[in-house]
Amino acid sequence: GLHSWKAMDAYIFPDMEKMYRPELMKDLTKAADILVNAINDKIKIRVIGDYDVDGVMSSYILYRGIRMLGGEVSCRIPHRVKDGYGIRDYMVDEAADDGVGLIITCDNGISALGAAKRAKELDIKYILTDHHEVPDKDGVESIPVADAVVDPKQKACTYPYNMLCGAGVVYKLMSYIFEGKNDKSYINELLPFAAAATVCDVVPLADENRIIVSNGLKILNDTAHLKNTGMRKMIELLELSEHIKSGSLGFRIGPCINAAGRLDDASLGLKMLMTEDEKEAVKLANELITLNEERKELTAQATDDAITQIEETNALERPVLVVYLKDCHESVAGIVAGRIREKYYRPAYILTDGEKGLKGSGRSIPGYHMQQALQNCQ
């Protein structure tokens, strides 16, 4: 609810001037100084993101922003199956082999203690940006030792709003740097990608997130003047020009970006955003759209198989549903678990064969803490 005139005004008139000052976020100015110095010193920079929409958009915001500042930057997006989630120690070794002097994580890293330690051992500067909860044991946070840790969910961070997505966090970082250079055009160019990630990562569309999405949509709907070739071609192929709403991001554009991370390689989506060649942009956008259609078919089949198994066994006698689907693609297990939870309104796990043993995903209902329940089984 809205409990003050100020909150009501921000909700009705979500103007960019009402965004909080970036420097209020812990370590953000420190991260900005490290990044700008690395660019000025011609140090190679490596961005390490994630394979979902937020991870791809976060990576692009950093990549594009650093390129606009004249920096030398490359990106590494983990493969869902081969690498798993988040930065790994060997990714730091890869960066060292490539002569990288600064690593920046986005939408991941807050739980990767080993990677931060490895970077320090190799004398690589390490900026951690994330938006996930900080691992906590008995009330004590376990935070990686990095040159800068930018995560609004840290207890020591007093930023007024801690529900930004990963792209929202790096957007604040880049906007702070560009403000210092008095160039708002670059800030506006990056905004639509923070907006897309905000919707697709399903963070609350309130407070600062609402401002990001509202203003990002205005830029996206001016398709003819949209600077990003890949995003413009995706919008045209999906026939969304000048009719883009938050639902368009969440249910049309987002799933196409996500499909690459689920069925192929998430770097496809990033390549589409990076390219300035119109023919390549169309080719990549079409690939993503095709992958999403395939993902829909796989999800529908796996959901039908799960329902059949539940209905034909005594599964509904148990308060928690656990379903093993041999032929389910592991990348759609979470979507299927969500649909099973919705149908039967009880916690659901979908398991399938992984490279080593079983892999799966779970979706819960209010009042049932899945992580705690799993820990109790150990």
Residue ranges, per PLM feature:
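Hydrophobic helix-and-loop "lid/oligomerization" segment in the mid-to-C-terminal part
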Residues: 1-102, 122, 179-378
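Conserved phosphate-handling catalytic cores of large alpha/beta enzymes
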Residues: 95-203, 209
